Amino acid sequence: MAFRGRRPELRGPPELYYDKNEARKYVRNSRMIDVQIKMTGRALELLCVPEDKPCYVLDIGCGTGLSGDYLSDEGHYWVGIDISPAMLDEALDRETQGDVILGDMGQGIPFKPGTFDACISISAVQWLCNANKKSDIPAKRLYCFFSSLYSVLVRGGRAVLQLYPENSEQLELITTQATRAGFTGGVVVDYPNSAKAKKFYLCLFSGPSTSLPEGLSEDTEEEKPAESTFTADRIPYRIARRGVVRKSREWVLEKKARRRRQGKEVCPDTQYTGRKRKPRF
């Protein structure tokens, strides 16, 4: 029973830990899907990419493609990289709209310089802090990852990496290697006083240093506990993405709220918000 509480990174290499059974959970467990989608939405919000212009986004540790589906839903194009063949097989079975490749981020990002406008990563970077074989040196693998990421981003591009650091020393190791690679930025912490809802987002800028976004707190948004449910079938990716119908009133209100948090000017909500226009003569 004590084994259940161990961090996934301590149970073995990611390509072995994320086998077919583990990959299946990511498309059948409603709790895992909901958490993944919320963190992706928050990462995209922290990126501050233009909402009226599609961007080319790199998804590090893309897994089954849930984060990529969210990006597609927001009108962006994406490419994902993951070290687990089983996770990528699930992504292909779900017919994700982005391209996925098998690769180890600790060995660098295999793309030409200036390929991507932005990058996101959900729950992946902390895996680089563990040495699964004698040749693995966490500091070197982190630097290789960040230096190649810096290269593949356009000038002024941003990366938001959600991660679960084991302790403050591990977080310092990650941020130090990112700084060595040329990035500016810092860590944004959402719900810092909550044991369960607390989330770390490493916000990196490949251009001039800018002010970091503010982290969410219990005063800005109330976190509600969610329950896990399992189904025998895969959840269709359009339902798994958000549970909100695109262009619906709820979808419009959520998008306007996100723009307000980014400090953008947004029209006030009215009874006509999200209502479809009648056809003209």
Curated annotation (Swiss-Prot):
May be ubiquitinated and targeted to degradation in response to pro-inflammatory cytokine signaling. One of its GO terms (molecular function) is protein heterodimerization activity. It catalyses: a guanosine in 18S rRNA + S-adenosyl-L-methionine = an N(7)-methylguanosine in 18S rRNA + S-adenosyl-L-homocysteine. InterPro entries: Bud23-like, Bud23_C, Methyltransf_11, SAM-dependent_MTases_sf. CDD domains: AdoMet_MTases. It comes from the Eukaryota. It is an enzyme of class 2 (transferase). One of its GO terms (cellular component) is perinuclear region of cytoplasm. Its EC number is 2.1.1.-. It is found in: Nucleus; Nucleus, Nucleoplasm; Cytoplasm, Perinuclear region; Cytoplasm. GO terms for biological process: chromatin organization; positive regulation of rRNA processing; rRNA (guanine-N7)-methylation. It holds the Pfam family WBS_methylT. Keywords: Chromatin regulator, Cytoplasm, Methyltransferase, Nucleus, Ribosome biogenesis, rRNA processing, S-adenosyl-L-methionine, Transcription, Transcription regulation, Transferase, Ubl conjugation. Heterodimer with TRMT112; this heterodimerization is necessary for the metabolic stability and activity of the catalytic subunit BUD23. Interacts with GRIP1. Belongs to the class I-like SAM-binding methyltransferase superfamily. BUD23/WBSCR22 family. PANTHER family: 18S RRNA (GUANINE-N(7))-METHYLTRANSFERASE-RELATED, METHYLTRANSFERASE-RELATED. S-adenosyl-L-methionine-dependent methyltransferase that specifically methylates the N(7) position of a guanine in 18S rRNA. Requires the methyltransferase adapter protein TRM112 for full rRNA methyltransferase activity. Involved in the pre-rRNA processing steps leading to small-subunit rRNA production independently of its RNA-modifying catalytic activity. Important for biogenesis end export of the 40S ribosomal subunit independent on its methyltransferase activity. Locus-specific steroid receptor coactivator. This is 18S rRNA (guanine-N(7))-methyltransferase. The lineage of its organism: Eukaryota, Metazoa, Chordata, Craniata, Vertebrata. The gene is BUD23.
